[in-house]
């Protein structure tokens, strides 16, 4: 019986407890079983998984140039660093942009609804792969590419491939102004 342990855990605002032994579930308890929690930037790990599945399924390549992946979304003037950027660079935080964009406090301030075009229009100051900058642009664009190639949002794409296998039921995902899953954050599990 774990009731005393649960009562003690409640005083620390523990959200859930799972007890396993030799790989078998012995007991579990959740403070709010149907409540979803925002996992914020840990969302990026799930977007990376989506990219991995898409690569495995032949929907995209890590070496694909962004100029080939997003031909309709490119700025009028394409600098040399953007021409070199690949899907792989989207996942490494070394995209080549000088500062982080699409960050939480910035998103409500954007006048532009098309964040793909906005993201690609931000100058690529550095050669991709040479400067680390924590940035939501890479994971966001990676998620967009998976959605475009798979024909569905990230929840629909990841549910049969990952979420069902992990026992994650009914995840939700924040979207950009055009309704695309925001691959850099806002996944609720």
Language model feature labels by segment:
Residues 2-33:
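A short, well-structured edge-of-sheet supersecondary motif
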Residues 10-11, 81-85, 110-112, 125:
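Extracellular/periplasmic catalytic domains that process cell-envelope and extracellular macromolecules
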Residues 23, 38-63, 90, 142-146:
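Active-site SXXK
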Residues 25-35, 120-128:
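Glycine/charged-rich beta-loop-alpha catalytic/anionic-binding loops adjacent to active sites
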Residues 35, 39, 78-80, 127-134, ...:
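Solvent-exposed loop and edge beta-strand segments that line ligand/cofactor-binding
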Residues 42-48, 84, 134-139, 187:
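Short alpha-helical patches at coil-to-helix transitions and adjacent helical residues
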Residues 57-97, 121, 150-185:
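Active-site helix/loop module of the DD-peptidase/beta-lactamase fold
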Residues 94, 102-110, 115-139, 143-175:
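Active-site cradle of extracellular carbohydrate-active enzymes
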